[in-house]
């Protein structure tokens, strides 16, 4: 990681991972990145959304080049939805199961969700290299942890929380809970106990002070 930048996003631009971009926001985003020396045209989006369905499955221990086709072939067994409205993806969930099969996390991502990112990329003049899912991004960071101890990692996003349980670099359990930091922000503002009236002030407050009773 060479540079990190946080750009405040107006209300309504992102709703549970789905983008509703405006040209004004796209221009603001490009200008903010450029001001901070980030001018690349190739981007990778990491998506966090409760609209994405995920399921751990076990498949025969085939070559890496054949996993995608195998997952897509069996997608209708994993996800009882109209698959014409979804893109199917996957990532390895950490080695082999006890029966010798590969542990794979299969994903079903709404095409409408992906299209909203293509829309933003077009507005910004970017080329999308690929998409990633937040739970996989988290696993890529954690998989080098070789501790034999069972460890729980909790990643809190805006509207959801990812709970990952690992041991020796392997995922034992991963679940997404439909509650995130926005719930805490709304509660802080509504309570009137913390003298905050907007989301950014609420975030700054609970970064500096324990706000749980």
Protein language model regions, located:
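Conserved, well-folded catalytic cores of nucleic-acid-processing
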Residues: 32-35, 77-82, 123-124, 191, ...
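Short glycine-/small-residue-rich flexible loop motifs, especially phosphate/cofactor-binding loops
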Residues: 30, 118, 185-186
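Helical mechanochemical/support elements of P-loop NTPase systems and associated helical scaffolds
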Residues: 21, 25, 67, 71, ...
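Non-catalytic, solvent-exposed interaction/assembly segments
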Residues: 1-74, 115, 149
